[in-house]
């Protein structure tokens, strides 16, 4: 079966180019750092430190520690991700055992439409309105904070679920996990994080595009983003005029540079990208609704309810 057209339309090959370019830059920095240290150690090979080691011997000792620390951190991360899932299984609530069982039905439908593995959805006690996906192998997991369940509307939750599932569909969670070995490198971790976040911000735009292409409703996706970022109460005040003014204020070289220190794009820029998107048009093929015939779902999980 061919990959659904909307998945191709929402994705950008340049995302993968930026990711691998970021990885290559990180590797280049490591090689350059080690090479410079090696050269310096050669010039100072005759000098003895307070422990009785030559600078050359100290150099190799430090770099072995550097390498082992990075590898140990990466392996610890892989294990901690699996532990995290088990922790959520023990302490969080799976939506199929709650009043939010419709979220599981919705995610299963999205997974079938997008031809991807079904995901686990868990709710954890946290008043902050947030959601995230994690996992580098099946089963993948989406965690919703209880604050999101309490304040977000059903349509906003649908958009959030599709956004998080996009990260899994496009391999963002897997790529982020594997590239995190650079974030654990002592001394250079913060620099590598800054470099990798260029790809991370692009992945957020891509997930927004897939949510838009799937739901075919700009307002639904925008409301979900605004709700998560500033809350449902203030979201009512975030009208088009306020959005335009904030875009104007953030459209400067300094503000664009400031954004490079954020793991996510500015909210106003995400909303602007959605407004300017041409993904919703008459030529875009719709997902077949024939899959619904064999599903026992409530009216709440019908595809494209806002469109």
Regions found by a protein language model. Give the residues of each.
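Hydrophobic or amphipathic, alpha-helical segments that drive membrane association/targeting
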Residues: 1-128, 288-307
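Short helix/loop segments within enzyme catalytic domains
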Residues: 97-118, 193-250, 279-282, 287-292
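Residue-level signature of catalytic and energy-coupling elements of molecular machines
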Residues: 107, 144, 207, 225, ...
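Active-site scaffold of zinc-dependent metalloenzymes
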Residues: 113, 128-153
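Short alpha-helix carrying the canonical HExxH Zn2+-binding catalytic motif
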Residues: 143, 153-170
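Catalytic Zn2+-binding segment of zinc metalloproteases
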Residues: 165-181, 218-219
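Hydrophobic, aromatic-rich membrane-embedded alpha-helical segments
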Residues: 177-196
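Pan-zinc metallopeptidase signature
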Residues: 244-307
């Amino acid at each position: 079966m061919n990959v659904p057209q909307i998945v191709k339309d929402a994705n950008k090959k340049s995302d993968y180019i930026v990711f691998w370019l970021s990885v290559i830059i990180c590797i280049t920095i490591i090689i350059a750092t080690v090479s410079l240290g090696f050269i310096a150690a050669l010039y100072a090979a005759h000098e003895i430190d307070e422990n009785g080691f030559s600078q050359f011997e100290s150099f190799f000792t430090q770099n072995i520690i550097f390498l082992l620390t990075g590898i140990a951190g990466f392996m610890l991360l892989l294990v901690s991700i699996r532990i995290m899932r088990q922790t959520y299984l023990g302490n969080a609530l799976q939506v199929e055992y709650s009043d939010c069982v419709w979220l599981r039905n919705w995610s299963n439908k999205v997974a079938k439409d997008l031809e991807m593995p079904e995901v686990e959805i868990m709710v954890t006690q946290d008043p902050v309105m947030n959601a995230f996906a994690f996992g580098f192998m099946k089963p993948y997991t989406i965690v919703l904070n209880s604050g999101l369940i309490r304040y977000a509307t059903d349509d906003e939750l649908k958009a959030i679920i599709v956004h998080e599932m996009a990260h899994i569909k496009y391999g963002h969670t897997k790529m982020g996990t594997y590239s995190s070995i650079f974030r654990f490198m002592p001394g250079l971790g913060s620099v590598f994080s800054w470099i990798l976040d260029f790809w991370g911000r692009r992945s957020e735009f891509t997930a927004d595009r897939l949510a838009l292409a799937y739901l075919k409703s700009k307002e639904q996706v925008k409301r979900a983003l605004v709700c998560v970022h500033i809350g449902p109460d203030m979201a009512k005040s975030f009208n088009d005029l306020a959005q335009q003014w904030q875009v104007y204020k953030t459209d400067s070289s300094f503000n664009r540079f400031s954004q490079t220190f954020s793991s996510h794009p500015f909210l106003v820029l995400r909303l602007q990208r959605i407004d300017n998107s041409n993904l919703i048009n008459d030529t875009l093929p719709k997902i077949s609704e024939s899959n619904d015939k064999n599903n026992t779902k409530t009216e709440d999980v019908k595809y494209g309810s806002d469109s």
